[in-house]
Regions:
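Conserved alpha/beta-hydrolase
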Residues: 90-112
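Alpha/beta-hydrolase active-site loop
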Residues: 116-137
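Hydrolase active-site cap/lid region
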Residues: 158-210
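Short beta-strand/loop motif that positions the catalytic acidic residue
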Residues: 224, 230-232, 236
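Short alpha-helix in the alpha/beta-hydrolase fold that links the catalytic acid
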Residues: 226, 240-250
Length: 301
């Protein structure tokens, strides 16, 4: 009996250690060399306004594009993504009459933070960004809409629980923090990954809190009356369409103001390539669809 108990204790301790080591390595700080800005986007970069704001103990770096007007689009970037990864999408929003506020998340690129912490950190960072924007008078804009990609697509839906916004666009969004971590783990090691599920949940609850880790994008959408557009690539191999995506939980969202769009254009139906055309510019058709959704469905027009 003592041997069984000892073996169990050793298994628990070993599982906790392995979980923490792998998790912390996965969400290590992300930095990279600056990419050259395409000549067509140099005026966009030259005219943007740099801002900083606090998220917890860290100072985050962001940019405001535009000088005021009707609607500000606050963008939440994906995991291992920086502000400049979305310059073509930002330009499209500006050309369509919207302002944009976007930022580097904790532990990424130009923002402070020793690590990216986890999926839930995107929720906290976006909450801090929205609070900062609200206290700044939305930088001269009347309304705010949200656009998020990947981890950011999860965060913008969770923001519905705490902020009044005109509309939400989620692209390639994961449904929950646990699904965001478990899906790639299971893809690598199979069903055995679920043996560490309780330790992973407890570690994230310790890093954040149980309420935040338990947030589900589908639940937040279902409890809101805000228009939401969920976009997902048919062949997304990072957040699978019928796996941990928000789209996979569509049956839990019984709301007429929510639209679902599966993007199936070849070579543009993955996790990130759905945002771009073959020449590296924005996916013109998708961005036009998104802007039309904002024009036709947003609250407070």
């Amino acid at each position: 009996m003592i041997g069984i108990t000892l073996a169990f204790v050793l298994w628990v301790v070993g599982s906790v250690v392995v979980t923490v080591l792998i998790y912390d390595a996965t969400f290590a700080r992300y930095e990279r060399e600056e990419k050259p800005v395409p000549a067509a986007l140099e005026p966009l970069v030259a005219d943007r306004r740099a801002v900083t704001f606090s998220s917890g103990d860290n100072t985050l770096a962001g940019y405001v594009y535009g000088d005021g007007g009707d609607m500000l689009v606050v963008m939440a970037p994906g995991y291992h993504a920086c502000v400049d990864d979305y310059l073509w999408q930002i330009q499209h929003f500006l050309d369509s009459g919207y302002g944009v506020f976007v930022f580097d998340t904790t532990g990424s690129c130009h923002s402070e933070g020793e690590s990216a912490v986890g999926f839930s950190q995107a929720v906290w960072d976006l909450d801090s960004a929205l609070t900062f924007a609200e206290k700044s008078g939305l930088f001269g804009y009347r309304r705010v809409a949200l656009f998020g990609h990947s981890r950011g697509g999860y965060a913008v839906c969770c923001a519905l629980a705490a902020h009044e916004v005109a509309a939400v666009i989620s692209v390639a969004g994961v449904n929950s923090a646990m699904e965001g971590v478990m899906e790639p783990a299971a893809a690598r090691v199979g069903f055995v990954a679920y043996g560490n599920y309780p330790f992973l949940w407890l570690y994230q609850a310790w890093l954040f809190d149980a309420e935040t880790v338990s947030l589900s994008a589908a639940d937040c959408i279902a409890q809101s009356d805000t228009p939401v557009l969920i976009v997902h690539g048919k062949n997304d191999d990072a957040v699978e369409l019928d796996g941990g995506s928000i789209y996979a939980h569509r049956a839990e969202i019984d709301a007429p103001q929510v639209d679902f769009l599966v993007w199936d254009t070849p070579q543009q139906d993955g996790h990130s390539d759905l945002l771009f055309d073959a020449d590296g510019t924005e996916n013109e058709a998708l961005m036009t669809y998104i802007c039309q959704f904002l024009e036709q469905n947003s609250k407070g027009k």
